[in-house]
Amino acid sequence: ESGYSKNMEAAARYIKSLDSGRLVHYESMLQLKGAEPAIDSPETLDVVSRMYATTEYMENEFLADEKETRPFIQCEYCHAMGNGPGDLEDYWQVIYSNKRFCGGLIWEWCDHGIYAGETESGKPMYLYGGDNGEPVHDGNFCLDGLVYPDRTPHTGLLEAKNVYRPVRVTAQNIQQ
């Protein structure tokens, strides 16, 4: 998550010279779309990569751009903190609607709390931002995964499992 520049493009070209089959994406190239010279180059970036693009953007803007032929991936589209994964199905309905959509990645897999024993009732206790007296911290922002620090699933993982299920059954011509 940084800016995009000619140096990034040179690095992408170098990667392609080493391995022409290697997929290259970089989300921050969108910050300079329309810049001269054009650095959002299909020769160096194989996919259009966005973070948190809305389903409306995907359907109404990305697909409407007739010059853009690359596939689209949400390199980050859902933040698993708290009740964050609540809109996965909406995204996947759009993703399944067009072969140019490649899916998306959830931020992030695991909470980063530090095990600190058990509570009096026997439940695991985890330390996080500020619990060690540090003056600068991100509070509970490190507890934003699909699983707890002990890898027990959050409800968000159960939703993702359902949305990512390998088989979907839909009714077709139900009146016949």
Which stretches of residues belong to each language-model region?
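Extended substrate-binding grooves/exosites of carbohydrate-active enzymes
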Residues: 1-175
